[in-house]
Amino acid sequence: YFSYNDKIIKILEAEYLNADHHFTSGTVISDKLEIACGSGILRVKKLQQESKKALSIEEFLRGTNILKDTVLK
């Protein structure tokens, strides 16, 4: 999970990509919500905001704009 705009968002489905990067862990590195983590990249596919139904990443991004270079906690 991660926190964004004071809301907890659970990652329900994701894919790990083994890729070198120079970003700080937790940094959003694409407009499709790919997140730098350790020695790879987490590509989020499905998530759920607190008190809301689960959404595909496409559905989520239609209503929420998480900008590239945002660092998630």
Swiss-Prot record:
Keywords: Protein biosynthesis, Transferase. SUPFAM superfamilies: FMT C-terminal domain-like. InterPro entries: Formyl_trans_C, Formyl_trans_C_sf, Formyl_transferase-like_C_sf, Met-tRNA-FMT_C. It is an enzyme of class 2 (transferase). It catalyses: L-methionyl-tRNA(fMet) + (6R)-10-formyltetrahydrofolate = N-formyl-L-methionyl-tRNA(fMet) + (6S)-5,6,7,8-tetrahydrofolate + H(+). Transmembrane segments: none annotated. Its EC number is 2.1.2.9. The keyword Transferase applies. GO terms for molecular function: methionyl-tRNA formyltransferase activity. Pfam families: Formyl_trans_C (PF02911). Belongs to the Fmt family. Attaches a formyl group to the free amino group of methionyl-tRNA(fMet). The formyl group appears to play a dual role in the initiator identity of N-formylmethionyl-tRNA by promoting its recognition by IF2 and preventing the misappropriation of this tRNA by the elongation apparatus. This is Methionyl-tRNA formyltransferase. It comes from Rickettsia rickettsii.
